[in-house]
């Protein structure tokens, strides 16, 4: 009714400060889809999970839970943002290789759930400390369709620099 088109779900800060769970993310996703909006579902692992080699397990659990009871037709409208928690607001960022590996793995999980055609239609973004200097190379990765930009989007100079980097 008020023109909202996109809704971010499962952001790490919502999970940390408000106790949002995989189950509540799923319930919200179903509501967002049923109301004609596009969900951007955030998934990602903590530093401890990353260092323990559990990244794939963590994101698979989050993706499978988020898509529970979502039809293939609705799944095509979903955006998934991989945001490694250890990279948010820390100045650390996953290498392009790590980001591509995890985003490709996420696409594979969607393919397991719905088939390759749906997986190719789902947009997958990277959202861990995206900066102008790293954006263009990140978006050249085959399984990264965009970026979920946080803090850098709050500074005009940084945001303009990102746009300019894409135009180079």
Report the location of each language-model feature:
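Active-site loop-to-helix "anion-binding N-cap" substructures in soluble metabolic enzymes
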Residues: 1-168
């Amino acid at each position: 009714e008020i023109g909202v088109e996109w809704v971010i779900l499962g952001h790490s800060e919502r999970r940390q400060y408000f106790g949002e769970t995989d189950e509540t993310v799923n319930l919200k996703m179903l509501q967002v889809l049923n109301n004609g909006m596009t969900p951007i579902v955030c998934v990602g692992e903590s530093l401890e999970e990353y260092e323990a080699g559990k990244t794939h397990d963590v994101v698979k659990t989050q993706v499978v839970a988020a898509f529970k009871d979502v039809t293939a037709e609705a799944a095509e409208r979903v955006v998934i943002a991989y945001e490694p928690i250890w990279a948010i607001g820390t100045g650390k960022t996953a290498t392009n290789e790590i980001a591509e590996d995890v985003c490709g793995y996420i696409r594979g999980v969607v393919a397991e759930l719905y088939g390759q055609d749906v997986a190719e239609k789902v947009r997958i973004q990277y959202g861990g400390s995206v900066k102008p200097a790293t954006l263009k190379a990140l978006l050249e990765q085959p399984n990264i369709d965009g970026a979920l930009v946080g803090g850098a989007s709050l500074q005009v100079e940084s945001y303009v620099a990102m746009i300019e980097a894409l135009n180079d």
